[in-house]
């Protein structure tokens, strides 16, 4: 009986399956101009350095769906400001590609989130003006750490999985609540749980 259940811990492979089966959301990414190839280039650390036949799977966002953003932060300051005109141009270019989610991964955002936040606001505003509902995922919120590739890859993975995970967990929570059970805590790969 539901009355005897105090906690529910739920483990799932939803995200792993989405990534392996390539069934995630349609993602458009925004990256600092000059760094739009970051996900394709990866870290350049290979176990078989001279194996020219080595193949990596394509990233969840294709090169044609990465929009260059003309801005540049440097440690300790702004080298090239992100203008309102550039925000409007990027927002339009992103939404013209009809994404489910948008991943914003600008250089040095772990240290200064201003440009990512400014761009996220512009995209949300333009989406609302077009009557669209689009999730915007910023790298400074997902993984506020140095190392551009890791931060970008993690942010894109979050954007790729978010809609399906939200739908799955929302449905699970609703069904449990309808039967009188408490909301589940979701187990993480790091060993903890999340509400």
What are these regions (language model features)?
Residues 1-195:
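N-terminally biased helix-coil "hinge/interface" segments that flank
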């Amino acid at each position: 009986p539901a009355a005897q259940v105090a906690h529910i811990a739920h483990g799932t492979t939803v995200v792993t399956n989405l990534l392996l089966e390539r069934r995630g959301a349609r993602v458009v990414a925004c990256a600092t101009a000059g760094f739009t190839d970051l996900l394709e280039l990866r870290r350049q650390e290979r176990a078989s350095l001279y194996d020219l036949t080595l193949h990596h799977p394509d990233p969840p966002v294709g090169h044609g769906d990465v929009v260059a953003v003309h801005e540049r932060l440097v440690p300790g300051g702004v080298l090239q400001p992100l203008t309102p005109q550039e925000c409007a141009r990027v927002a339009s270019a992103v939404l013209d590609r009809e994404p489910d989610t948008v991943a914003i991964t600008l250089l040095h955002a772990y240290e200064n989130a201003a440009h990512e936040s400014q761009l996220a606001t512009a995209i949300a505003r333009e989406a609302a003006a077009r009557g669209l509902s689009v999730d915007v995922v910023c790298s400074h919120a997902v993984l506020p750490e140095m190392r551009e590739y890791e931060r970008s890859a993690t942010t894109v993975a979050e954007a790729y999985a978010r809609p399906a995970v939200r739908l799955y967990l929302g449905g699970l929570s609703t069904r449990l609540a309808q039967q009188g059970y408490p909301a589940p805590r979701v187990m993480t790969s790091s060993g903890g749980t999340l509400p």
